[in-house]
Amino acid sequence: TTLTINGKPTDKVVTRTGFRQTEFANGMVKLNGRVIQFKGYAQRTSNEWPAIGLSVPAWLSDYSNGQMLASNANLVRWMHTAPWKQDVDSLDRIGLMQAMPAGDSEADVTGRRWEQRKEVMRDAIIYFRTSPSIVMYEAGNRGVSAEHMAEVKAIRDRYDPHGGRAAGSREMLSKALQDVAAGLIYVLAGAGFS
């Protein structure tokens, strides 16, 4: 990707993209034409290591995220805020899907807090929209109002209209409000786990 000003290149960066086809319809999720069931982890966005902390090399992110893949997970639902670029790139490399939140609290919010959440969602979508591993944008850790869900979907539709990504919120099962329920909790409960 090249940034040009007045026809002259001023900055350049390698932009990697990947391709996949998704469909969220009729109560099913399809990836590349095949029905799948999300199964995986709700991971802290910091994804830190004991005694090392957050600043880990890329290979350690690949190793850590690879452990989830090796345990038969196919999705990571990051907690509360968008992950750092290194983890997004890692999941792109190893082929693990992710649900990306923008920023939330344990409930729907109003006023300036909601406006901030929308701003963070917009910025995260713009920054990560070329990452094929992101299959879902999460509006909140808990359900949000119908109006708020519509606003998040409008942000997605404006800044990532062809990305094939769902928009949803954890603990919000109304099909009329969202594309997919983001909570892995329901998969686990349906399998007899609590």
Regions flagged by a language model, labelled:
Residues 62-67, 74-194:
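Substrate-binding/catalytic cleft of secreted carbohydrate-active enzymes
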Residues 1-94, 120-121, 135-136, 152, ...:
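Secreted/periplasmic carbohydrate-active enzymes, especially glycoside hydrolases
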